[in-house]
Regions:
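A conserved beta-strand element that flanks and buttresses the S-adenosyl-L-methionine
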Residues: 109
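Short catalytic micro-motifs in class I SAM-dependent methyltransferases
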Residues: 112, 116
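Class I (Rossmann-like) S-adenosyl-L-methionine-dependent methyltransferase catalytic domain
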Residues: 1-45, 49-101, 117-201
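Conserved acidic residues
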Residues: 106
Length: 201
């Protein structure tokens, strides 16, 4: 089924094919919040799924917008919403986010999204991130799966490709680590990367 179609992701959710969902906030992101490395701001969570990470950042005072292609995922985000922890939920193709959101966000958060996108659209994805972030904004990615596998999804991800795509657009790599907090089944197959958009071009 076409990864560019909401039907593919809807079917995965409806039939238990959502193995990317950890069922809780990502430990690596939780550690970021606990160590105070980032300051609260406006955050877009792409391919947000059931919203575990989006809710965790909202709970820590971030103004969160969470977007997912799947109607089921958006419904789950609404169902699991925590009173007093507001966040905006958008059910739509992230490539169709309106230009009214251009340069709106201090952060874009990504996990198991880049690997789900048709590799032919990766340039388009990075252009989208560039468009949505404020000058000086930060793209936070837990890049996964770092592998040479053929086919997908999940499609293989390489740090070298991410470095090339973001640095071509003037982004600066400000953080790179292989986190010890990764869940055991993904340890060694993911890296935390942060790229900062230039303030001026």
């Amino acid at each position: 089924m076409d990864v560019n179609s909401a039907d593919k992701w809807e079917a995965d959710y409806q039939h238990g094919g959502d193995g990317w969902d950890l069922g809780a906030p990502t430990p690596v992101f939780r550690n970021l919040l606990e160590n105070g490395q980032l300051s609260p701001g406006k955050m877009l969570v792409v391919c947000a799924g059931r919203g575990h990470d989006a809710r965790e950042f909202a709970r820590h005072g971030y103004q969160v917008t969470a977007v997912d292609f799947s109607p089921f995922a958006a419904q789950e985000m609404s169902r699991l919403a925590v009173p007093g922890t507001p966040m905006e939920i958008l059910q739509r193709d992230l490539f169709t986010l309106p230009h009214g959101l251009d340069e709106t966000f201090d952060y874009v958060l990504e996990y198991t999204c880049y690997c789900a996108i048709d590799p032919k659209r990766r340039n388009e994805f990075v252009d989208l991130i560039d468009r949505l972030l404020k000058p000086g904004g930060i793209y936070i990615s837990l890049a996964f799966p770092l592998t040479q596998k053929i086919g997908g999804p999940p499609f293989a991800v390489t740090v070298s490709e991410l470095l090339r795509l973001f640095q071509e657009r003037g982004f600066k790599l400000i953080e790179r680590e292989q986190p010890s907090e990764s869940v055991p089944q993904r340890r060694g197959a993911e890296e935390l990367l942060m790229f900062q958009k230039p303030v001026m071009r």
